[in-house]
């Protein structure tokens, strides 16, 4: 595992990123960009690497705003400071960074947990043709609220494979947000939705096994080798 802090790009400094492979081993591999949840950091999701197909180069990205003992992508939706512009500002910065590093890779896939799923789905809405697949874990999709960054009608025609795993008893994501997310994903993506009882607002081994199988099925160049543990 190697740490990398990229140099400045366009209008914003590039994020702090943890990579699964050194730079000289990344060329030609599919890229998986991981986006953590609220008040976490770029190391938070690296514990799932052993479950992911070996072909991927994984880049786990730190959110831009320090909060508590971690970082956040944008204010919580129930906070007065929240706006869709705060979401799209964060999303645009990650889009710009991905543009700067994606060239050596065969494809780009996104994986987001909780608020990270909101960022991942927003990136997909901004660039419907850019991603092989998206994985959303215990998360949600944000309402458009008139943002010109999102191209939902174009995305409807793309039908990008999207895995959404969650627990119906998740105590963190409100029910109205889940209802919106479910309807939006059904309309705009090729959705694989799986429920996991007793997981609450987290990730478990069964879900990660399903994520592995999903990625093996939908991302070109990823072999269907079984998980050896």
Segment roles from a protein language model:
Residues 47, 122-126:
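Active-site signature of alpha/beta-hydrolase-fold catalytic machinery across serine-
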Residues 158, 163-166, 170:
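Short beta-strand/loop motif that positions the catalytic acidic residue
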Residues 111-116, 120:
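Gly/Ala-rich beta-loop-alpha elbow adjacent to hydrolase catalytic centers
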Residues 129-142:
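A conserved short beta-strand
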Residues 142-161:
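Conserved serine/cysteine hydrolase catalytic core
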Residues 7-105:
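Serine-hydrolase catalytic machinery in alpha/beta-hydrolase-like enzymes
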Residues 176-229:
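C-terminal catalytic histidine-bearing segment of alpha/beta-hydrolase fold enzymes
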Residues 143, 168-173, 201-202:
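Acidic catalytic loop of the alpha/beta-hydrolase fold
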């Amino acid at each position: 595992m190697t740490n990398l802090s990229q140099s400045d790009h366009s209008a914003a400094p590039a994020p702090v990123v943890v990579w699964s492979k050194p730079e000289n081993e990344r060329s030609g591999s599919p890229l998986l960009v991981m986006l953590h949840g609220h008040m976490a950091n770029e190391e938070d999701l690296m514990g799932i690497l052993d479950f992911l197909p070996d072909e991927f180069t994984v880049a786990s990205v730190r959110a831009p705003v320090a909060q508590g003992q971690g970082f956040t992508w944008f204010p919580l939706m129930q906070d007065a400071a929240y706006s869709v512009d705060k979401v799209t500002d964060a999303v645009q910065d990650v889009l710009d960074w991905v543009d700067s590093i994606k060239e050596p890779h065969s494809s780009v896939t996104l994986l987001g947990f909780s608020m990270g799923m909101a960022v991942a789905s927003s990136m997909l809405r901004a660039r419907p043709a850019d991603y092989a697949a998206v994985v959303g874990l215990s998360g949600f999709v944000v309402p458009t609220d008139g943002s010109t960054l999102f191209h939902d009608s174009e995305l409807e025609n793309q039908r990008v494979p999207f895995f959404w795993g969650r627990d119906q008893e998740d105590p963190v994501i409100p029910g109205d947000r889940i209802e919106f997310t479910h309807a939006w994903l059904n309309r705009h993506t090729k959705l694989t939705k799986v429920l996991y009882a007793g997981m609450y607002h987290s990730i478990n081994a069964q879900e990660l096994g399903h994520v592995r199988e999903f990625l093996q099925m939908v991302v070109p160049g990823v072999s269907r080798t079984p998980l050896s543990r």
